[in-house]
């Protein structure tokens, strides 16, 4: 979990912005979005295959 210490003269808004940025860089939001709903293993494999195909096509 991301942790941000609030300085003495720091506003809550700037601390919240730093926390959001830290979570974004750590991939917390993407991970939560990925686990939002259950995904069958067959669907995971299909998505992975499609992503590889898209990557290969772009090169």
UniProtKB/Swiss-Prot annotation:
Stretches the record annotates as Disordered: 34-59
Superkingdom classification of source: Bacteria
BP GO terms, sorted: translation
Transmembrane feature ranges: none
PROSITE patterns associated with the record: RIBOSOMAL_S21
Signal peptide range in chain numbering: none
Gene Ontology CC, one term: ribosome
Keyword Ribonucleoprotein in annotation: yes
InterPro entries, A to Z: Ribosomal_bS21 (IPR001911), Ribosomal_bS21_CS (IPR018278), Ribosomal_bS21_sf (IPR038380)
UniProt entry keywords in alphabetical sequence: Ribonucleoprotein, Ribosomal protein
Ranges annotated as biased composition (Basic residues): 43-59
UniProt GO MF annotations: structural constituent of ribosome
Pfam assignment, any one: Ribosomal_S21
Membrane listed as a keyword: no
HAMAP family named among the record's database cross-references: Ribosomal_bS21 (MF_00358)
Family statement: Belongs to the bacterial ribosomal protein bS21 family.
Protein name as it appears in the record: Small ribosomal subunit protein bS21
Designated gene of the protein: rpsU
